[in-house]
Swiss-Prot record:
Family: Belongs to the TRAFAC class TrmE-Era-EngA-EngB-Septin-like GTPase superfamily. EngA (Der) GTPase family.
PANTHER family in alphabetical order: GTPASE DER
Role description: GTPase that plays an essential role in the late steps of ribosome biogenesis.
Protein name stated in the entry: GTPase Der
Boundaries of every EngA-type G domain copy: 3-167, 176-349
Entry keywords, A to Z: GTP-binding, Nucleotide-binding, Repeat, Ribosome biogenesis
Entry binding sites for GTP 2: 182-189, 229-233, 294-297
Occurrences of domain KH-like (ranges): 350-434
Keyword Protein biosynthesis in record: no
Quaternary organization: Associates with the 50S ribosomal subunit.
Length: 443
């Protein structure tokens, strides 16, 4: 599971600035989907080969007319509880204020590893600033400038060194890892029961990392699977009895840990903004996607047509994903999900050599050439596999920075069709080859 770092502090201390600085590297790989409201409170970053999930709690608190919003019973409380460690940000220019002390008192009760970072500090006053905030009780503060990044690397190096070790909970032969993602009350727990089946074989059910995620291995038709329970579904006395609680953090962790995501829609409620935001996150994670539209049996013909039209209209950015119209309660259509899981997983495991990808690139260019830039055609030379999770194909060429996003989407679709990637979002990463003559004086 991705380690979670929560950025906490009172308003206007620079939480979003630090969040944006740490996550800016993702912008080159993942573009916003048109028409989808981007959720800016959660972001992924990679530091020294360690992938992290960052949570900017500043976007989660209603601070209107309040100096310090209450932490209790808010998403901030949930984010803090589900994090592995906390970056507590304060403002050097404002100095230590009562709001900082109130937050510090609450954080001390959490039992988490907390790093105190003093933002907006001049180098000349670093020692003075550190002594002012030392009384908060989190050890020596780290002096940073989030806007420029000064001091941030040293801070994050210490964060990485203090992350709790993840426990090994999955044995070797557990098969395909499946995550169930969806809004609250769309039928996730019912579908999980249906997937596990009446004659299920539960190998084990034990806590995973410090965030208490749970892996549930099971077998069906001699095939092994593992259900990743990180969306807040917890067993009670009986396995049939589940309690559901939505968590964006655990949903994001599930996406990144899974081989295949089943995204569940409620046919009676249609496509909501929250559905679109979750789908956007799944595309970013690059995991294989299957869309299951639940409670289908309760709709008449006209209502079904309306739902299909709404999906076509509002979800064109996931048109690569297979759709299944099901009833988790009665089991209608659920059997097809297992075939889709197998096919989707196998398609992403196929061999992808540089030669194969380059030949596909050449055919794509021959069928639809890149546009002209200042009268010259953008040249794409070769392609190779950058990563499988997310599936990233790196395309090398000249002047690739000028390639429009529409052409990158064309290439992604072409690769998907050529290699029959089933339900897999394809990310295109463009690289411009160095110009050997750049920087030389004209003669």
């Amino acid at each position: 599971m991705l380690p979670v770092i929560a950025i906490v502090g009172r308003p206007n201390v620079g939480k979003s600035t630090l969040f944006n600085y740490l996550t800016k590297s993702r912008a080159a790989l993942v573009a916003d989907v048109p028409g989808v409201t981007r959720d800016r409170q959660y972001g992924e970053t990679t530091i020294d080969s360690q992938r992290l999930l960052l949570v900017d709690t500043g976007g989660l608190v209603d601070t209107e007319n309040k100096e310090v919003a209450p932490l209790a019973e808010t998403q901030v409380e949930q984010a803090i509880d589900e994090s592995d460690c906390i970056l507590f940000l304060v403002d050097a220019k404002a100095g230590l204020v009562p709001a900082d002390e109130i937050i510090a008192e609450r954080l001390h009760k959490k039992g988490k590893k907390i790093f105190l970072a003093v933002n907006k500090a001049d180098r000349a006053r670093a020692a003075v600033v550190q002594s002012d905030f030392y009384k908060l009780g989190f050890g020596e503060p780290y002096v940073i400038a989030a806007a420029s990044g000064r001091g941030v690397k040293d801070l994050m190096t210490q964060v990485l060194e203090n992350l709790p070790e993840e426990k090994e909970v999955i044995e070797k032969e557990v098969g395909i890892k499946i995550a169930m993602i969806g809004r609250p009350n769309v039928g996730k727990s019912t579908l999980i029961n249906r997937l596990l089946g009446e004659e299920r074989v539960i190998v084990y059910d034990q806590p995973g990392t410090t965030r208490d995620s749970i892996y549930i291995p099971f077998a069906r038709n001699d095939e092994n699977y593992t259900l990743i329970d990180t969306a807040g579904i917890r067993r009670r006395a009986k396995i049939q009895d589940y309690v559901e609680k939505f968590s964006m953090i655990k949903s994001l962790q599930a996406m990144h840990a899974a081989d295949v995501v089943i995204f569940l829609l409620d046919a009676r409620q249609g496509v909501t903004e929250q559905d679109l935001r979750l789908l956007n996150r799944i595309v970013e994670a690059g995991v294989s996607l299957i869309i299951a539209v639940n409670k289908w049996d309760g709709l008449n013909i006209e209502e079904r047509d309306n739902v299909r039209n709404a999906i076509d209209r509002r979800m064109p950015f996931v048109d690569f994903a297979r759709r299944y119209f099901i009833s988790a309660l009665h089991g209608t259509g659920v059997g097809k999900l297992f075939r889709a899981i197998q096919e989707s997983y196998q398609s992403i495991q196929q061999e992808l050599t540089t030669g194969q990808l380059t030949r596909a690139l050449e055919k794509a260019v021959a069928e639809h050439e890149p546009p002209l830039v200042k009268g010259r055609r953008i040249r794409l030379r070769y392609a190779h596999l950058g990563a499988r999770h997310p599936l990233t194909i790196v395309v090398h060429g000249k002047k690739t920075k000028s390639l429009p996003q529409s052409y990158s989407r064309y290439l992604a679709n072409y690769f998907r069709k050529t290699f029959n990637f089933i339900g897999v979002p394809v990310h295109i990463k463009l690289k411009t080859d160095p110009n050997p003559y750049e920087g030389q004086e004209e003669r």
